[in-house]
Curated annotation (Swiss-Prot):
Family membership noted in the UniProt record: Belongs to the RimM family.
Keywords tagged on the record: Chaperone, Cytoplasm, Ribosome biogenesis, rRNA processing
Ranges of residues in domain PRC barrel: 144-225
Chief localisation class: cytoplasm
Pfam family, one: RimM
Assembly and interaction partners: Binds ribosomal protein uS19.
Species of the source: Burkholderia orbicola (strain AU 1054)
Compartmental location: Cytoplasm
InterPro entries: PRC_barrel-like_sf, PRC_RimM, RimM, RimM_N, RimM_N_sf, Transl_B-barrel_sf
GO biological process, alphabetically ordered: ribosomal small subunit biogenesis; rRNA processing
GO CC entries: cytoplasm; ribosome
GO MF annotations, alphabetized: ribosome binding
Protein known as: Ribosome maturation factor RimM
Amino acid sequence: MAGHDSGNARRGRASFGAFVRKPVERDSVANAGQAAEQGSPEATQAWPDDAVEVGAVVDAYGLKGWVKVATHADAGRGGDALLNARRWWLERGAERLSVRIMQSKTRSDTVVAQPAGVSDRDAALSMRGFRVFVRREDFPALAADEFYWVDLIGLEVVNEQSVALGKVSGMIDNGVHSIMRVEYPATGKDGQPTTDERLIPFVGVYVKTVDQAARRIVVDWEADY
């Protein structure tokens, strides 16, 4: 979920939040931090205002209560928010839990973790299907010219002539760089109001400024492109 920036090699490199959900588990190990907090998964209605979905529990890992999470972005590209957070919020249907994380580490493009109070494989297996959320404030800090996708969604896009081009509705990773999906109101062939889309590469040659405070992105892009 990152992209190469031909005008600014960092813009758009770290990305997260607009994702393709990964349906499978994968494998390989690297250590992350651990916390000496105690507790157990507990039902909660107190959902953080800045909660961002970052993955889903897909399996147990080992015999001692660890879970395996398929992440929506690789570690180092936003998925490491799971490693940074000491508390996860879990949702499966109408069921919501809050859980402290004792240890976590990467295993290929998954994250494996030990939730407090989950002590055996059966308990870990019972957590399959939970979607995993962390607070936006738990995402690792980025350099000034790097952005998480989740922070770009909904921003207004205008060109250098101040012509409104639409709003960012999503992001695409084409393997080389990130691409903004910019939706704007249009008229269909039947004369009825509809929504159309522009695809604008999120690279320095086109993206001139990203002002998150003003919720605006300025691009070098004509309205008739």
